[in-house]
């Protein structure tokens, strides 16, 4: 039995499963769970994981502490007595906001549809609880209706998931990062409980002597419900304790298997904070990385690189009033606690929700540069049909959903088991139904084996297996897809330079593969160490170039999607051109549809100007340390709030005069075209810098 098989034989998924269940013990809310950033429950769980790392034989086990904003959510219980005298008690979920009562306190509750600005017209909600129904996956995030309610004077907003999340059952609650201020309170209520409240509102209205509404009509749209049910209110009682704790501490728990040939490291990461029980997200992942560590130790594996196992705190949330308020623990680990990991860690294998099949086909999502190596690895796997009938694939680039993004922008090439596209997200994610009932043993076993093998495969490398041609091809494709004729000279220069650097990157990758293959032929320990030392500088330069590529090329749009620098302006130009053409033809409706897709201007249609302003400015003009991994990733913004409101007014006019609005759109279009040209020039400069770095690496590789 070879060493890999020996380690695989030591895998015990029952041990991992039981550890995942033990992580559920500590909770801030005794009924619902929650193990939140900086809370006593998170700290106690971290202490347990610290002891577990020691017990399985990891060395240098540490609690790496850092500052963050914490949250303790103890309870949110809503009581209501209906017209028949029946008392109802509803357990509500929480968000990272401040709200404390002295036992049960009485409130007036109103229902306001989707909670957009129009729903508040003619309503006085001061001091009241405002119940709304939202779809965070397909429409807007919780932060917008919450802040809208706060500005109108509401005591708190109660959000019901209409669709998008928590679809598994009408009793499902949901939790997400608030991405907003802590002084605008919010809670989560299930559809089933909301239906009881809505029925009582409907009954009150029906009881009015001048009303003929059918009290049993449950087929209304949200808009119809909002128009009807806003005419009444209910008396309810709320007992809640949700407390945000600014500037507290949390800790990432790390342990190691010491390397024998190099100071470089391979990192495995998962987060141990959670909403509700968090069995899949992310107990099963933390338990899996420790299960893999345990198997490697028991199997007697002596790695060349130091293997680091890190249970991250505060992935779900960790900073007040920031759009980029998640992945707090990971960002702090590599930028503040251990900046020395940058340039030393050759790969981060991050894990999310790994004990459930999110699709018929499994996927490893990774940075562009590692895609070829990962694909070669997955081609060697035998994937059990009972886990994934359609096998396994490789996806790029990484996304912002999880800690691997923070790792990548720090210059650490990262991967994650892909989880974001499957039905689990709509049904179970961040709800009380993410529990042991969604456990799939075959999937968990396969992931233990797959990633143990991947660790060993990476550990056998001398040089990071980076193919920068994948990155450059992706940049070129993004330009070809949306080429703009007014910038042809700049685009053509860039595309030629991309062809040059792509060829160079392919040559480098071929050489990297050759060097890694040569190392594999060495059996003498001293010869292997000497061979690694010979190529150490080249490895450092590859990681340095990767970090620069992340700095130069990775940007975000207003929906947190990973894009290249010119893509935001390119999309805006297309939409502004559509809007301008539509207005020239007097078609305000189509113009507004196009403007809806420019940057974050969908919110200009739906919410008060202060809401739009707040959630724009807190990205553009907030200290970098509060933007963390999102700092500097959005470069431009086109504020269309005024013109959107004006065009909505014009729609009410019989023969609207649109010359002024057309000129304003033309000005916006000129700005975006200038941004686009600047972005293309910036890209060209960046590609030239990266090309020079790659040329130096290639010359270094040829010099030995």
What is each of the regions a protein language model found here?
Residues 2, 10-14, 18-21, 25-126:
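Noncatalytic luminal/extracellular "stalk/propeptide" segments of secretory-pathway proteins
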Residues 3-10, 30-40, 111, 133-139, ...:
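Second-shell loop/turn segments in exported
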Residues 161, 248, 345, 353-477:
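Active-site-adjacent substrate-binding region
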Residues 449, 459-704:
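C-terminal non-catalytic alpha-helical accessory regions
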Residues 137-144, 148, 249-252, 274-369:
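Acidic/histidine-rich catalytic neighborhood of metal-dependent amide-processing enzymes
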Residues 4, 89-122, 178-280, 290-301:
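Soluble metallo-hydrolase cores and metallopeptidase-like ectodomains found primarily
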Residues 124-125, 145-155, 172-178, 330-340, ...:
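Mature extracellular/periplasmic domains of secretome proteins
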